[in-house]
């Protein structure tokens, strides 16, 4: 089933630790059957790209039997490293996180675009291995598990590795290795962006690497042309030859994927004379619905023998040639064809395809939360835990949110911490997965002072966000819209850009808040009665939250957020539900 017209309520899902009644099971079965009939009337084996919409960059994939597992970078969001499962490569259900215990992951003080970079996942002799880099705090590490659902071990640090993007390779002769992006020879760069790919022996039992380091690639495909940022390496053995793939060009418009080949795992590695094997940098930036910045790929082979690639890419909004996007770097899928002994990604098309056929029969009725195409997801907070797609800013160190204090509601304690600081504020977010869409909440909150605020954020980083909230002024309830002040490191680094007093009787009543994404603008709306919306402010600059303006490596998130702006508070905000809807223009042109 391709989830193109998918609406799902979390109260209809089976969650771990929560038993379903037969009536609920029957209802879910009928709902899924109806969805399958609707979807299959349109297509039997097609799927939408990106397969993971929103900021899910640096994908790595492995197959175990008929099951596929995929992980992505999560930077300074917690839990760390989301892990997804699929049976058909096209439809992915998040099954958890690799680093989901505070003792595994210390993100305190790290900026949003620091933290966890470029995980790589592999399976070997009954064990799942995942390598990753925690930038600025700890460096490179490996964790293991007997089950992708977890629990995963605590990180085993690899201090010998000087670099980022570690990737394990298990050879068929019993030897194991970790390769990674590292410093130039003698740490003397010939130009800005000069990096290398290096490798060490890896003991899969002790989880230690050898002291001997091998240099596999210096600079990139052709060092005379000053290639930059060779990174994200992986090795595969196919028909007796070793293939090393890596990203080159930097993770922006010049991004690409290149390949090298050797008869020996230790090299020498010879570059393909028709590199790159994946890029979009040569295409007209004014083309309709471009996918840009493609690279950082990983490969997987199906049981039937076909090869596929997952990789990151970006989707700018109109006008396309300006290169603005707020959804971050997303995960795409494309077929791999072998030509003259070399793997070529997306060989039948110049442009990355938004819709394509998959060789594996699409698994209908999986029941998971959709991650591709157009969809609506509504969380009514009736489960005993948050769903996996929710995320926090950095590692929680105290209990500040709950699902049991008020039945069917998510409660957030107002605390002094704010999203403009490198701390863990009262922030529960989910990714913006569409260029056009909305996020809506129903909020119950009675502010006790002017500095108490609760509502919904659209957040890119500590310096770039908009905050639509309920608060008070002079004891009267008010709806306010704030914009962050870039470069201001104070607790309240935001300026008021719109406000509207509420009816005095609404001070203790519910208020509905909505943020609508409209490509290069956002609109902010509120209501005190269902479906009777008032526009607080429209045409708000969305490029302020774009990667091009805000910088960094992440995309925007919608978040439920409550703060007392540096002052003590004993107040609580309660969210009755949160609804996300996405309907990009590209999906309307079927």
Residue ranges, per PLM feature:
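Hydrophobic alpha-helical segments, especially transmembrane helices
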Residues: 24-25, 538
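Short, Lys/Arg-enriched N-terminal segments with co-localized hydrophobic residues
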Residues: 4-21
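Carbohydrate-active catalytic/glycan-binding domains of CAZyme proteins
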Residues: 17-18, 40-590
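Bacterial N-terminal signal peptides
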Residues: 28-36
């Amino acid at each position: 089933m391709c989830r193109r017209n998918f609406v799902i309520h979390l109260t209809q899902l089976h969650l771990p630790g929560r038993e379903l009644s037969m009536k609920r099971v029957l209802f879910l079965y009928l709902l899924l059957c109806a969805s399958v009939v609707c979807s299959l009337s349109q297509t039997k084996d097609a799927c939408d790209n990106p397969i993971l919409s929103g900021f899910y960059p640096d994908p790595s994939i492995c197959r175990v039997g008929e099951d596929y597992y995929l992980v992505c970078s999560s930077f300074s969001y917690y839990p760390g490293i989301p892990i997804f499962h699929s049976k058909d490569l096209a439809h992915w259900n998040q099954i958890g996180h690799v680093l989901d215990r505070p003792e595994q992951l210390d993100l305190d003080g790290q900026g949003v675009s620091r933290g966890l970079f470029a995980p790589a996942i592999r399976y070997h002799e009954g064990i799942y291995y995942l390598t990753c880099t925690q930038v600025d705090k700890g460096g490179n590490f490996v964790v293991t598990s007997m089950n992708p659902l977890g629990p995963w071990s605590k990180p085993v640090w690899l201090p010998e590795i000087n670099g980022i993007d570690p990737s394990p390779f298990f050879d068929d002769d019993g030897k194991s290795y970790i390769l990674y992006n590292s410093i130039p020879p003698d740490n003397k760069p010939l130009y800005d962006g000069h990096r290398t790919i290096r490798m060490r022996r890896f003991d899969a039992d002790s989880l230690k690497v050898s002291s001997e380091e091998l240099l596999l690639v210096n600079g990139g495909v052709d060092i005379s042309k000053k290639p930059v940022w060779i990174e994200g390496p992986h090795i595969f053995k196919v028909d007796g030859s070793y293939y090393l793939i890596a990203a080159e060009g930097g993770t922006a418009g010049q991004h690409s994927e290149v390949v090298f080949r050797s008869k020996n795992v230790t090299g020498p590695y010879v570059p393909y004379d028709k590199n790159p094997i994946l890029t979009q940098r040569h295409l007209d930036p004014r083309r309709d619905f471009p996918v840009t910045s493609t690279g950082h790929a990983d490969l997987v082979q199906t049981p039937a023998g076909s090869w596929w690639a997952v990789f990151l890419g970006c989707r700018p909004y109109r006008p396309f040639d300006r290169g603005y996007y707020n959804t971050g770097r997303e995960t795409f899928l494309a077929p791999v064809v072998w030509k003259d002994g070399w793997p070529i990604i997306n060989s039948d098309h110049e442009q990355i395809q938004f819709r394509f056929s998959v060789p594996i029969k699409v698994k209908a009725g999986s029941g998971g939360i959709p991650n591709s195409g157009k969809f609506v997801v509504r969380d009514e907070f009736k489960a005993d835990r948050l769903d996996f797609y929710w995320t926090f800013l950095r590692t929680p160190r105290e209990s500040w949110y709950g699902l049991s204090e008020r039945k069917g509601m998510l409660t957030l304690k107002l605390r002094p911490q704010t999203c403009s600081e490198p701390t863990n504020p009262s922030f529960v977010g989910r990714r913006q997965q569409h260029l056009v869409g909305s996020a809506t909440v129903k909020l119950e909150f009675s502010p006790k002072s002017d500095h108490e605020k609760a509502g919904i954020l659209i957040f890119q980083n500590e310096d770039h966000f908009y905050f639509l909230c309920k608060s008070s002024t002079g004891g009267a309830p008010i709806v306010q819209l704030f914009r962050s002040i870039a470069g201001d490191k104070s607790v309240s680094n935001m300026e008021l850009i719109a406000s509207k007093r509420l009816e005095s009787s609404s001070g203790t009543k519910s208020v509905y808040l909505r943020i609508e994404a409209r490509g290069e603008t956002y609109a902010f709306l509120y209501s005190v009665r269902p479906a009777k919306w008032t526009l607080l402010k429209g045409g708000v600059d969305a490029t302020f939250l774009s990667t091009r303006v805000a910088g960094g490596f992440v995309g925007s998130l919608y978040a439920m957020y409550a703060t007392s702006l540096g002052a003590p508070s004993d107040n609580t905000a309660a969210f009755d539900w949160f609804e996300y809807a996405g309907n990009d223009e590209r999906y309307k042109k079927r």
